[in-house]
Amino acid sequence: MRPHAARCCVRGTGRRLRKSLGEIPQAVAAARGRTLSPGTESPCLQGHQGGIRASGLVGGPVCDRYETLNLMTYALAEDNAERQQVLAECLDPLTLPVLQRIPKASITRILDIGCGQGNTTRMLAEHFPDASVTGLEYDPALVAHAAAHTGNRSGVHFEQGDASRISHSDASFDLVFTRYLLTHSPDPAAVVRGMLRVARPGGYAVAFEPDASIDYCYPPHPCMDLVNYLWNRAFPHPRIGRELVPMFRTFGPSRLEAGAVIGMDHDRGVYGRFYRLTIEALGPVVEDRNLMAQDDYAALVADLRRLEDDPQTIYFKFPDVWVIAQP
């Protein structure tokens, strides 16, 4: 056993830490309780029944609890450029095989919803070089950041807008794409409905979202239990991936294809950086919601950094679920 493998966040406040660790099973169970049971309806879908072009639809109801949580985690995408780049390094190799299922010749106009700093928009532009790509982002500062880091690349531009209230006309894009947006969204069903509305008949709406059911490494380390604990307490929809298929089906696509992938990192250390940077970005949330004693949190980050630098550690990322739907 490696010297640090049997310890995690043990300095200073053992009693409080044991209390925090004791709460983890209940917290994870509570998060799992949001998973749909057979015959029940997701709160994300309430009020969204009917066709994708139901009259007057611009968005939909917001679950108050999810809206509050979303405000806590939104900063993850705003000020952490390094994390966003590492996230792209983790997810691009998993996303591109999904995009390869779509015939390139049929794609000339693409909408990238929740584009953040523009990493996914640039990925789409590279994969579909003959298409024009529009990145849609709510935060004006991120729109400016994305544009500045894209330069004068032909066929790529960014605009400010609300993902749950897409302003574009019906059937105006060949491909509508989103990645890791619904997990943050206060109303993911409104986003999905809007995606199918603005995709043309025969076009494609593609979502790629996490199902953060487990985070683990080998050899196993107790730090990852705390990572899973925080992930399931801080994000609005940490397991939205498992709800994607029923959510898309609610809006009656003509065709739907879905699958799941699990990433593994044994030599680059990129997943280790991804977990550590995410937990660092959650610092204000941990403090504001008192999810963990601050010295325990600092010890967790330090342990994640040490684990990240261990060349013997193999990371297995939680599953990601993808859906390709056609209106």
Where are these regions (language model features)?
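Class I SAM-dependent methyltransferase SAM/SAH-binding core
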Residues: 109-111, 117-165
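A short SAM/SAH-binding and catalytic strip from SAM-dependent methyltransferases
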Residues: 174-187
